[in-house]
């Protein structure tokens, strides 16, 4: 509550005399929160609260500028010391909501192809030494969430010795396959909850943890999304479409689709 009052005071200083209604919009898994600031005429902007002692705004601004070739929120105001940003409001309709509202395969295919076009645009700008490396340590850390968080904490059933041996053997087999993939910019959470339904192309959110890593990662995140499921034939068709688009754009995907899809499936094991 103290942070919210601090935020309201800051907004009043930035927009003196304006009657602004502030409503909660969303929160990330970390300390970052978002509010929707609404003016009497109906205009709105999104306000980010990112406490500088925990997370700050630097990573968000850096990746936002790197991904500016696609539809990311325009930044209007920033207070680095307090951890506040006022940015463009891309609306309330996520891809997930749109896909759940209209379940026709034709609609899903159209929206997902638009998302894949956006992904290819992001990847076309890839270059090394710009974003953190998605290396073995980071991949291993993500994989460790399954035994350490999901099994032990969420389910209350930590792996026994034999199960842990099997898990470790699986990880040992998986990591080389993932690390062998060519690298591009990776959004790292390119899922339907982080894409907004906006005219022409999806708005892209929650990109601040982007890295430089495996080329199939974001396509897998989108097409193997944990919050929505499609028939295997549908996913295969879209994976082919992505591979074709990536090849046409000169991205470092395998020349043979079979090789790409094998890498895609390996990445799916790590991702979900």
Which residues does each predicted region cover?
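Juxta-kinase regulatory segment immediately upstream of eukaryotic protein kinase catalytic domains
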Residues: 1-20
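ATP-binding glycine-rich phosphate-binding loop
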Residues: 20-35
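Active-site acidic catalytic loop and adjacent metal/ATP-binding pocket
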Residues: 31-38, 171-217, 229
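ATP-binding pocket architecture of kinase catalytic cores
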Residues: 35-139, 145, 151-156, 179-180
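Protein kinase-like catalytic core scaffold
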Residues: 46, 71, 85, 184, ...
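Short, contiguous acidic/charged loop-to-helix segments that flank catalytic cores in large enzymes
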Residues: 51-54, 209-210, 225-233
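Helix-rich C-terminal or lid/interface subdomains of diverse kinases
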Residues: 110-113, 137-172, 177-182, 248-272
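Active-site activation/catalytic loop segments of kinase-like enzymes and analogous catalytic loops
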Residues: 145-154, 215-252, 268-272
């Amino acid at each position: 509550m103290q942070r919210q009052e601090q935020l309201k005071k800051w907004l009043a200083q930035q927009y003196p005399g304006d009657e602004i209604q502030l409503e909660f919009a969303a929160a990330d898994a970390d300390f970052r929160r978002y509010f929707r600031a609404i003016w009497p005429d109906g205009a709105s902007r999104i306000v980010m609260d990112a406490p500088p002692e925990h997370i700050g705004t630097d990573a968000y601004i850096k990746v936002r500028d790197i991904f500016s070739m696609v539809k990311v929120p325009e930044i209007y105001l920033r207070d680095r010391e307090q951890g506040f940003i006022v940015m463009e409001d891309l609306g309330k309709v996520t891809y997930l909501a749109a896909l759940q509202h209209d379940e026709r395969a034709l609609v899903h295919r159209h929206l997902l192809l638009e998302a894949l076009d956006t992904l290819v645009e992001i990847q076309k700008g890839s270059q090394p030494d710009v974003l953190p490396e998605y290396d073995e340590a980071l991949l291993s850390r993500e994989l460790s969430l399954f035994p350490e968080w999901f099994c032990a904490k969420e389910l209350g059933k930590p792996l026994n010795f034999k199960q842990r041996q099997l898990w470790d053997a699986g990880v040992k087999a998986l990591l080389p396959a993932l690390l062998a993939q060519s690298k591009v910019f990776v959004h790292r959470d390119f899922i339907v909850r982080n894409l907004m339904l906006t005219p022409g192309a999806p708005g892209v959110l929650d990109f601040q943890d982007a890295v430089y890593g495996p080329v199939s990662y974001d396509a897998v995140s989108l097409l193997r999304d944990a919050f929505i499921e499609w028939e295997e034939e549908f996913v295969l068709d879209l994976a082919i479409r992505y591979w074709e688009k990536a090849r046409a754009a000169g991205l470092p995907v395998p020349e043979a689709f079979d090789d790409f899809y094998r890498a895609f499936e390996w990445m799916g094991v790590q991702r979900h």
